[in-house]
Amino acid sequence: MESPPHPLLLLLTLLVAAGAASAGADDLVAELQSLRSRSPSGVIHLTDTSITRFLSAPAPRPYSVLVFFDAASLHSKTDLHLPQLRREFALLSASFLAHNPASADLFFADIEFSESQHSFAQFGVNSLPHVRLVRPEHTRLAGSEQMDQSHFSRLADSMAEFVESRTGLEVGPIVRPPLVSRNQMILLVILFLVSIPFLIKRIMDGETLFHDRRVWMAGALFIYFFSVSGGMYGIIRHTPMFITDRSDPNKLVFFYQGSGMQLGAEGFAVGFLYTLVGLMIAMVTHLLVRVESLQIQRFTMLAVMIIGWWAVKKVILLDNWKTGYSIHTFWPSSWR
């Protein structure tokens, strides 16, 4: 009968195994940091092989990984906003790295469907956009935590809230690149200083755009059209001009039935009808009254009423089709 292993030998074996595991984890962290340093935004591009190496390592791992799932073939689908979300994800990574340059607790990565279909299947991803947080204790990729769609609403800022609430790490303010670079700003200032004498002369002579009433008229029309077409709503909500029909990918949808969403095309269509009526009223009150021919005035007024009735009818029908609400006519009681 063999004697049991000596306790000292068993302890030594366990220490060697723990040291090897620690060294392996340190090697993974060092490799991730090296890959991160090669990326301008700090986002590490992973494939099936690297996902197995970094995310299937024995738990608990000393790091978490936030993974963005991408598909280049779907970038043309404007309703998914994949290119924009990918840029915001890169901003999130760069901002975290700017505020935590030496952090090895969280890494940002992306994978592409055509290169890593096996990993998509392991995560159980079947729709995009999709972001997963793989924490140190996760032993299965499918068991990682999915970012809710609501965290895409404010782009990088809402993604940062998800990261901070799930990891306890502070991302810090999102660092966005300036619209104008330093050299461009210097050039603009120089051009402005050089043009000051010429601007003063044109202002004194009354030859600027601000002295042209046609410019003010065009600006007023643009503001009116922009307001009635829901342009500000489209900018705030990032609504697309149109979407692809789910039942027929080759068909485009310009009018969305339902009050929960408005496409840019339908807003512009309604804005055009409103602007058309406004222009006709302006023409009648400012131009038609100067026409001396009574027949031309009557014919023009009849045409304006017909076109105005058609435009208002189209707006009412579209509103009824979209929201389900109907507009009823109420006559004065004395007319009944």
Curated annotation (Swiss-Prot):
It is a multi-pass membrane protein. One of its GO terms (cellular component) is oligosaccharyltransferase complex. The keyword Signal applies. Residues 1-25 form the signal peptide. Residues 26-183, 237-267, 320-336 are lumenal. The keyword Signal applies. InterPro entries: OligosaccharylTrfase_OST3/OST6. Its main location: endoplasmic reticulum. It is found in: Endoplasmic reticulum membrane. The chain crosses the membrane at residues 184-204, 216-236, 268-288, 299-319. One of its GO terms (biological process) is protein N-linked glycosylation via asparagine. Residues 205-215, 289-298 are cytoplasmic. Belongs to the OST3/OST6 family. Component of the oligosaccharyltransferase (OST) complex. Subunit of the oligosaccharyl transferase (OST) complex that catalyzes the initial transfer of a defined glycan (Glc(3)Man(9)GlcNAc(2) in eukaryotes) from the lipid carrier dolichol-pyrophosphate to an asparagine residue within an Asn-X-Ser/Thr consensus motif in nascent polypeptide chains, the first step in protein N-glycosylation. N-glycosylation occurs cotranslationally and the complex associates with the Sec61 complex at the channel-forming translocon complex that mediates protein translocation across the endoplasmic reticulum (ER). All subunits are required for a maximal enzyme activity. This is Probable dolichyl-diphosphooligosaccharide--protein glycosyltransferase subunit 3. It comes from Oryza sativa subsp. japonica (Rice). The lineage of its organism: Eukaryota, Viridiplantae, Streptophyta, Embryophyta, Tracheophyta. The gene is OST3.
